[in-house]
Amino acid sequence: MTSCDDKTESNYGRDDDEPVFMAMGQNNPKLAIALEQAGETLPDFIDAFRAGRHSEYPFVVKACFLGEDEEDRVHIWVLLNQLHEGDLVCSPIQIPEGFSGLQEDQLFILRQEQVEDWMINVDGLIYGGYSLRLAREMTSDAEKPEFDEHIGLRDFTDQNP
């Protein structure tokens, strides 16, 4: 498993039969702002994990992963299992069909600078999730209820976790 070093676009975009989530171009200026916000607040996320706050809820991070072919890349959410010397020990939550870069039950290490976004979903109140906020903003009003249900969203919060 190799993580992407640049902010290139995923080859796993939005399919016609999957209206809820869409591929966002990595050159989108709003996405750049969202990723910057996530990076600036990542220490709060890590502090919450270390302190055991919200420990009954999954702590997840988003990163870019390369497949066997370096042209094969995907930006996905993975579960934070533990911290090791400042790095994040993670495992996949869902692997896109056909993606060869990750295996179920695989553990891997992400450096903090590889994290694109982070999230804690506490009974529908989402801490972080800056790329999700943008994805929801880009979703039509008709699709927002489905989007919210899919991610279990009640509201976003800007409070520290």
Locations of regions flagged by a protein language model:
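Mixed-charge, low-complexity intrinsically disordered regions
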Residues: 1-161
